[in-house]
């Protein structure tokens, strides 16, 4: 495996994150317990392009009848977001928060990984109540985002 991937593994090991390494690709699967809930994560390296991706996954797939309101919520949340973005897969209802770092000609340090990972999981944890509220509590996307961003 590459030096980039070894840096990721070292960071997660030293920071006491349990991970499972995917055999066929430079991917780590992890879990995170935030203040608002538990969700799965994935750290991935694109070796050719020298990009580090980190994803946090909303813990349930959005029911088909709620996907349009979740798309509105995500659009409202993404507007003005400085780091990362939410994504919705309309096919299966998967919601994830993605951050990425282009590390071509840059050393991927433990500090860079830490800043990248913790910004990601903090954001997903912050928006969990909004996502759950729109899906299960019939809160409007606008109200849900306003409550989070107050």
Please provide the spans of the model-predicted regions.
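Long, contiguous binding/interaction regions
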Residues: 67, 89, 99-100, 113-126, ...
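Beta-strand/loop substructures that line and gate deep hydrophobic ligand-binding cavities in soluble
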Residues: 93-106
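Short, internal acidic amphipathic alpha-helical interface segments
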Residues: 57-94
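Short small-residue beta-strand/loop micro-motif enriched in glycine and branched aliphatics
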Residues: 51-55, 105-108
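Ser/Thr-rich, low-complexity intrinsically disordered terminal regions
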Residues: 15-39, 43-52, 59
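Short, highly charged C-terminal tails/helix-capping segments
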Residues: 132-150
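Short, intrinsically disordered, mixed-charge
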Residues: 14, 72-80, 122-129
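Amphipathic alpha-helical segments
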Residues: 1-19
